[in-house]
Amino acid sequence: KAPNGQTMHFVRIIKGDINKGDYVTLTVDKENRFTTCQNHTATHLLQRALKDVLGEEVNQAGSYLDAKTLRFDFKYTGKITDDDVIKTEERVNELIKENLPNETEIMDADAAKKTGAMALFGEKYGKTVRVVKFGPSKELCGGTHVTNTGNIRSFAIKTIESKGLNVYRIEAVCDTNLEIELFKIIKPYNDEMILLLKKAKKIVSDAKE
């Protein structure tokens, strides 16, 4: 943002040019916005699910998301098993199926924290904050989200890895991006099956000659 609080936009000129003083019209890329919202809300649900499965000691250490994927770093001193990962994924999908509504409220920062709203450690907040709530998930957040958790449709954890002492990173996908990832995984096996089928047909054909 600019020093006076105005939002600044970075643009890439595809055709033509822009000059100082020009007026421009901005439009939202609805598809990109929707999938980004899916991943953002899913990140909130993931943190809630991790706390439900591993315990309240889980704390966010960072995150990244875009229209295709989400990444969540967190601190946890214990060992994470495959069963923990499965339970976490299942818990997120349970919250999705509950169609929990987006309840957003502007509150005094101290009052918000007293309600149990999660805040990112080390982050500086103003006197008033925006609280985003989806059922048991409640966080201080200024970003865009879906109107209810059912909009996410589906969620899957791609990977989980250690990023240092007691720090883990989860990468996950939602909805149509999940389908794309599954296709990437299945395609090599599918191509191999097609090749084997062609070889089998050739062997049978050669045997008949």
PLM regions: where:
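A glycine- and charged-residue-rich anion-binding loop/surface
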Residues: K1-E209
